[in-house]
Amino acid sequence: MDHVQQLPYSNDAGLGQTAKIGLIVLQTDQTLEDEFRQMLVIDGVACYHSRIANAMHVTPQTLVQMQTDLPLAARLLPQAFAFDAIGYGCTSGATIIGEAQVAQLILAEHPSAKVSNPLTACKAACGALKLNNIALLTPYSPHVTQALSDNLNASGIKVCRTGYYDIEDDFTVGRVDANSIFNAIVALGAHAECDGVFVSCTSLRVANIIHRAEQKLGKPVISSNQALAWHLLRLSGVSHKSAQELSQKTGQKLGQFGTLFNQPLPN
């Protein structure tokens, strides 16, 4: 064995020295991880994923079932990583299960982490952008769409226009093309009473059309994935200025994902 030898090594601080972010992704989601890879190309930010079992068909009944599996999904993100923030990636799930319940289940496994979900992130984004009257676009059934609209209205964000696709199959949601989404955003957001648009659902591919839609409308556009990425960065202590400086090292331009990325957390 004289040709085999033990070699010396040293350790450094590892990945995620700017921020360690955890993400709980639905089993059926085709989009969230891909869009986060685009939006979190920031030097020193590490993002780790766990998957949670869910039904392909999106109904209030199937959504509420996820709260049983949420602790296991959170547990698969190792506590030893000392996450700064963890996001549960389902807007409709957070609506039906409840934002506080989602946070409680994740915090039971990661008590020192900040927690978010796309619904909570949307509310924070509306506060940061000072949006009070929004148009809402969803792929959901009328029942799930109404539950989300009611939740936003109850939080003080008036939903003045609503459009939905009525798709219960999450696989199909992930295949809705960019032109369909762009045209829907413009049609809803063009109404004068709307000061912005929220596109709900982590499966919808919105990230790469946000900038174009904002230019067309002259109004902010928020998506579930964009809001969640922004909120998790801010909760992790990555300010707008820091994110811009760190992203320049990787050649990324965060402004391409909307005006939201220029905003701090609301007070």
Regions found by a protein language model. Give the residues of each.
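N-terminal glycine-rich anion-binding loop in soluble enzyme alpha/beta folds
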Residues: D2-A73, Y140-D177
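Short, well-structured alpha-helical segments in soluble
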Residues: Q67-F81, S180-C194
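Hydrophobic alpha-helical segments within soluble ligand-binding/sensing domains
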Residues: L70-P71, R75, V115-K130, Q226-V238, ...
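Glycine/small-residue-rich loop that forms an oxyanion/phosphate-binding "nest" at active or ligand-binding sites
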Residues: A73-T120
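Periplasmic-binding protein-like
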Residues: F83-G89, A135-L136, C194-C201
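Conserved beta-alpha
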Residues: V102-E109, A113-D170, F261-P266
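Hydrophobic alpha-helical
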Residues: F182-K216, L228-A229
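C-terminal functional extensions of proteins
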Residues: S223-N267
